[in-house]
Amino acid sequence: MINISGYDGFTGHMDQRAHNVTAKAGMHGLTKAIAREYGVFGITSNTVAPGAIATKRDPAQYKHVNVEHVLARLAIKHPGEAEDVAEACLYLAADSGKYVTGQVIHVNGGEFMF
């Protein structure tokens, strides 16, 4: 099982999005619970948590975002691409990821590190 979430569930968010933070934290917990409960059957459960990913979005929705401020927080000084997230999912779904379970894989250019 591969969930797509985000890191707000670990850090909170400042834009009155408690509902979003709660849902993401719940997703992280579900990922771990499924990994424990169903690992005995060979089922893996992980979450991929994207960060700043360049996608085709409605520009009006993100007009308040200061791109330079976002990029300054990244260890890798450019946004990721949708393919970066897809590659993480492919790794988890392939045989190469068969021993990875209960994890949150952060694809965020080093913005958030554990």
Predicted regions and their residues:
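A glycine/serine/threonine-rich, flexible loop-to-helix segment
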Residues: D15-R17, V40, P50-L74, D84, ...
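Catalytic loop of short-chain dehydrogenase/reductase
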Residues: I2-G26, T31-V40
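A conserved structural motif in NAD(P)-dependent oxidoreductases
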Residues: L74-V85, S96
